[in-house]
Amino acid sequence: MSDQDNIFERLSKILRSRKETSEDNSYTSQLYKEGIEKIIAKIKEESEELIEASTSDKEAIIHEAADLVFHVMVLLAFKDIDPSDILKELERREGVSGIEEKSKR
């Protein structure tokens, strides 16, 4: 398994540790201290930046998508949700029509 295959797991461990041991010089610890509203605001901000970057070059899109994924992972750690739960949900949806899946909610 390559390092890329484990990035979500490794990042999740780091984010959980930042939640448990608040470090003054840690951006993530600061987000946790400021709470859910700040985390949500960052996700909104990063979503908007990704939308803006969508008309730019590939590198800008990759950069902004990584920022958004990072902040979503901060939210998951804040809410004690493991990224593997998201992957399981995506696997559950695999091969199911989006229209069909949405109608089951």
What is each of the regions a protein language model found here?
Residues 1-65, 69-105:
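Flexible "arm" and connector segments at domain edges
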